């Protein structure tokens, strides 16, 4: 989702009109009513058992009617990521989780249901987006579950003090969720800056050359996405080498590659590319570990 709000300034002609009070004679027409909300649902996998309000078998997500930051869609990437989180409980249970650019907030809600100790779900500091996230939290969580999640605004690359303020003093997050964000190529550096500042650096495992993959309990980030613009897939993937070179270095591995269907049937580009969700996990390199890509966890 874009983190570049567009700022405008008045030109000399507009200033002149304001000075002469012409706006009083020719008032601007009222803005049209915002598009109505829409709703989407996520069906909980049959092999997963936890309580949802009203004993529903699905989570209900309200989507903003329209938004330049694309919060008006429930992306297939979020669905695939949520299923991965439910089927890989060790990566979420009893963890502090932060989701960036959350949209409707589905993965964050799933993390709470899966047993995360604290979840902070964020998006750009736009009140319409944040109010919608609060609505989805209220609809899908109850009681103590609702106490384990908070909604906050954050602009990537800016101060993370408000985000860390949700945790006990001196602590950071064990898991970061980035769902369909890397398409925003101009914001890779800002996104990495937030990642570096919020993920805990404490490692529970030492590097084992015979097993190059970090344990799933290692502090890590999940980066799931679809190449919505196939001709720019290389620019999406540029996020990872850039991440690998940041800080003290990062390693990353593919954990998911799944056909989910193209979001928009008539968009240009190979439909198979546009409809495949890719999931990666990244972690800070441990002592003696080389940065960069590791062998995939999946059989392609």
From Swiss-Prot:
Coiled coil: none
Major subcellular site: cytoplasm
Cellular component GO terms, alphabetical: cytoplasm
SUPFAM superfamilies cross-referenced by the UniProt entry: S-adenosyl-L-methionine-dependent methyltransferases
GO terms (BP aspect): methylation
A GO molecular function held by the record: N-terminal protein N-methyltransferase activity
UniProt xrefs under HAMAP family: Methyltr_EFM7 (MF_03223)
Protein name, per record: Protein N-terminal and lysine N-methyltransferase EFM7
The organism of origin for this protein: Cryptococcus neoformans var. neoformans serotype D (strain JEC21 / ATCC MYA-565) (Filobasidiella neoformans)
Lineage, opening ranks: Eukaryota, Fungi, Dikarya, Basidiomycota, Agaricomycotina
């Amino acid at each position: 989702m874009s983190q570049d709000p567009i700022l405008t300034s008045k030109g000399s002609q507009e200033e002149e009109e304001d000075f002469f009070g012409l706006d009083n004679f020719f008032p601007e027409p009222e803005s049209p009513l915002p598009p109505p909300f829409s709703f989407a649902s996520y069906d909980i996998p049959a092999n997963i058992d936890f309580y949802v309000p009203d004993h529903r078998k699905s989570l209900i997500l309200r989507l903003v009617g329209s938004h330049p930051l694309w919060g008006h869609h429930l992306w297939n990437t979020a669905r695939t990521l949520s299923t991965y989180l439910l089927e890989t409980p060790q990566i979420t249970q009893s963890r502090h989780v932060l989701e960036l650019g959350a949209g409707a907030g589905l993965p964050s809600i799933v993390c709470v249901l899966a047993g995360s100790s604290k979840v902070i779900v964020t998006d750009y500091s736009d009140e319409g987006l944040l109010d919608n996230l609060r609505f989805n939290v209220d609809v899908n969580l109850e009681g103590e579950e609702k106490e384990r999640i908070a909604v906050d605004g954050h602009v990537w690359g800016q101060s993370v003090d408000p985000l860390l303020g949700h945790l006990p003093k001196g602590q950071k997050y064990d898991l970061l969720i980035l769902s369909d964000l890397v398409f925003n190529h101009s914001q890779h550096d800002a996104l990495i800056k937030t990642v570096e500042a919020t993920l805990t650096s404490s490692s529970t495992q030492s590097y084992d050359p015979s097993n190059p993959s970090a344990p799933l309990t290692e502090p890590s980030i999940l980066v799931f996405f679809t190449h919505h613009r196939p001709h720019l897939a290389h620019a999406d993937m540029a996020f990872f080498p850039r991440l690998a070179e940041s800080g003290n270095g990062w390693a990353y591995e593919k954990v998911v590659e799944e056909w989910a269907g193209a979001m928009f049937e008539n968009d240009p580009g190979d439909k198979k590319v546009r409809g495949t969700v890719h999931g990666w996990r990244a972690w800070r390199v441990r002592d003696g570990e080389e940065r960069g890509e590791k062998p995939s966890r999946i059989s392609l």
